[in-house]
Amino acid sequence: MPPKIAEVIQHDVCAACGACEAVCPIGAVTVKKAAEIRDPNDLSLYEKGAAFQVCEGCLTCSRICPVVDGFIENELLNVRKFFGAKSKDNAGSQDGGVTSGILKALFNKGEIDCAVGITRNENWEPEVVLLTSAEDVERTRGTKYTSDPVVAALREAFEKYDRIAVVGVPCQAHAARLIRENVNEKIVLIIGLLCMESFHHDVMLDKIIPEIMKVNVRDIVKMEFTKGKFWVYTKDGEVHSVPIKDIAKYARNPCHHCCDYTSVFADISVGSVGAPDGWNSVFIRTEIGEKYFDMVRDEMEIMEDPKPGLELVGKLIEMKRKGNAEHFQEVCKEFSFETGIRSETV
């Protein structure tokens, strides 16, 4: 019997988080724009350059796939604390630099020995990397709005390190949580990012920025989604923007089925929505998240009641789910297994 992820791939809703590649015992899965699994009954996958080994049907991947697991109806139900924060060392960071600040402080305190993150080159092409020091964290500052299989890097991390932090968008945070609960407890902290949608890097770098926005990618120093637009800032001080509604159609297909905006499965979620300019919004979701944030609190400035607060976050949650929930429920009808949007707390 093929694993459940084969159906996820078939229906083009694979999030390409990389979890299946990270945990497959024999290396039968590789993740590119979507997962690809070697199935002896489907020779077309051999032609696509999928993994070297043939799937043996252990079904480990079915236990850690965020799409197979489904979504949570109320993603704010598990928020223990919500506040604004800014790292005291946030030069070069996006907004308040909280994510980088947490990782740097935990490395310096010896609480983690590895963090999985994304860096980029001067062409904004992303690369998943294993960070092993506070100095390494400096290379990953700033948000990247293109998708890469971050969680796949855990395969190497599990072999070399014992106290691993994972930073990722909702599907990646979800996958990391499932791996921690079902496969490997070396993941000690999951930091989830707020995400409306993401783009394949070739679409962003070859289509949206040069063709639609008429900007040279190599001139860009910062990108951000805010106030209903996608903004890019260039070396010469120019600012360019395009309405998000004009480029949303170019987002990855699984993003149009995603019903998690705030990384509900993370220990700590970090974003900018709900906090003033220059600050991050911080959601403490688990006892683990509370413990680790308390360790680094002295490295942060805290705003106890940020505005516009959770009211705006809630509006964006509803905005993301408005069409996506229906799309996801429709594809769920095609699966041979049960999944969907469930009313429970994680």
From Swiss-Prot:
- This one is known as F(420)H(2) dehydrogenase subunit F
Q: Quick one: which gene encodes this?
A: fpoF
State whether it acts alone or in a complex, and with which partners, per the record: The FPO complex is composed of at least 13 different subunits.
Organism whose genome encodes this protein: Methanosarcina mazei (strain ATCC BAA-159 / DSM 3647 / Goe1 / Go1 / JCM 11833 / OCM 88)
Q: How does activity depend on pH?
A: Optimum pH is 8.5.
Indicate the temperature dependence noted in the record: Optimum temperature is 39 degrees Celsius.
Summarizing the function annotation, the protein's role is: Component of the F(420)H(2) dehydrogenase (FPO complex) which is part of the energy-conserving F(420)H(2):heterodisulfide oxidoreductase system. The membrane-bound electron transfer system of the complex plays an important role in the metabolism of methylotrophic methanogens when the organisms grow on methanol or methylamines. Catalyzes the oxidation of methanophenazine to dihydromethanophenazine. It shuttles electrons from F(420)H(2), via FAD and iron-sulfur (Fe-S) centers, to methanophenazine (an electron carrier in the membrane).
Report the top EC class in one word. oxidoreductase
Enzyme Commission no: 1.5.7.2, 1.5.98.3
Q: Which InterPro entries match?
A: 4Fe4S_Fe-S-bd, 4Fe4S_Fe_S_CS, Co_F420_Hydgase/DH_bsu_N, FPO_su_F, FRHB/FDHB/HCAR-like, FrhB_FdhB_C
Q: Where does [4Fe-4S] cluster 1 bind?
A: C14, C17, C20, C24
Instruction: Recite the UniProt keywords alphabetically.
Output: 2Fe-2S, Cytoplasm, Electron transport, FAD, Flavoprotein, Iron, Iron-sulfur, Membrane, Metal-binding, Methanogenesis, Methanol utilization, Oxidoreductase, Repeat, Transport
